[in-house]
Amino acid sequence: MTIRQALWLTLCVLLALACMPLRADAASEKQSQPDGRALFQANCAACHGENGAGDRKPSDIGFAFKMPNFTDCSFANREADVDWSSSIHRGGRARAFPRTMPAFDHALSDEEIDAVIAYLRGKCEKSAWPRGEFNLPLAMFTEKAFPEDEVLNITSFNTSGQRAMTSTSIFEKRLGATGQLEVNLPFSSIVGPSGHGETGIGDMGVAYKQNLLADVDSGTIFSLLGEVVLPTGSAAKGLGDGTFSFETHALFAQIMGDYFLQGDVFGALPAGKGLPNEAHGNFSFGRTFAEDGGWGRSWSPQIEFLTTQAFAPGEKLQMDIVPQLQVSLSRRQHILASFGERIPLNDRGPDRQPQFMFYIIWDWYDAGLLQGW
């Protein structure tokens, strides 16, 4: 099976799954909840402390490493419920944490584990830090609304037509509870305007993202992002536009049971003459599956739809489709990879050829590059 056939098979599976009924809301299936606080005190407080602050002395718990502080919202709210649930069900080994964290899947029921998590969540219920449920799988082109601490590299190259390759390195750093700084720098190898091969850096972007809404109950997140693109690439060699450019993004995501929809609607406004303003709309729909009963390696097929409209005489609305698949590489799930193919749906030409794409992400807040495996 070729890569293109595999990607189209992924798309067909994803669309078929979209026709299945969504998972019922767990809250509607339960008449009453177990007492999460009492369960925590009986099963967890001996190591994690009575308040979940991880303040027990090493001499009291018998090991030296620092316990997590569940009252620290800058830490606790970054993680999704499924991450905590996996460590409780399968023990520390499930996410490459110390094996001193035992597995409770035979000691507590699923409902009791959910109640313990709900009790811990109550300590940061009114926190401004967006919940980890909104840290959805990254699509190739659709910027996420969730603020991140990560480094990634996205590489694309033409699969037909003239030779072209671009590799973009991106650094993202959270600022406070709801802000994020982003710096990206592309490196390209192309056939330039002269007809000869050209290699070098492209135009660097510096962006700031501000989250405005993150309602975990409704599954909705919304953020704004502004970016300045600097003319660091050579326009004469075809590696850059030769002018400053400004971008304004509206970012959103909606969680729908097991599925998610992400959107990135933005305008690109070049400062130099001769370059048209552009409007873009990128949208991604997908679902995440996990091995080992939902606690292991994650697989996230997505289908992305891209639109671009340049505001110049004779310019057509350009549309692309990008079937893709993300997979977690490390047990901590802080190292992820994705691959896919960008397929122009119309207006093909030398600058619009099918492209194979892949990326590697390192969520450096969760663990070091060589940790968590």
Each predicted region: which residue ranges?
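Periplasmic/extracellular electron-transfer cofactor-ligation site
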Residues: Q31, R37-K66, R90-P98, K123-S127
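Extracytoplasmic electron-transfer domains, predominantly the class I c-type cytochrome c fold
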Residues: D60-R121
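Bacterial N-terminal signal peptides that target proteins for export
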Residues: T2-T10
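Boundary at the C-terminal end of the N-terminal hydrophobic targeting segment
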Residues: A24-S28
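Bacterial N-terminal signal peptides
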Residues: L9-A18
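Transmembrane beta-barrel domains of Gram-negative outer membranes and organellar outer membranes
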Residues: E111, S127-W373
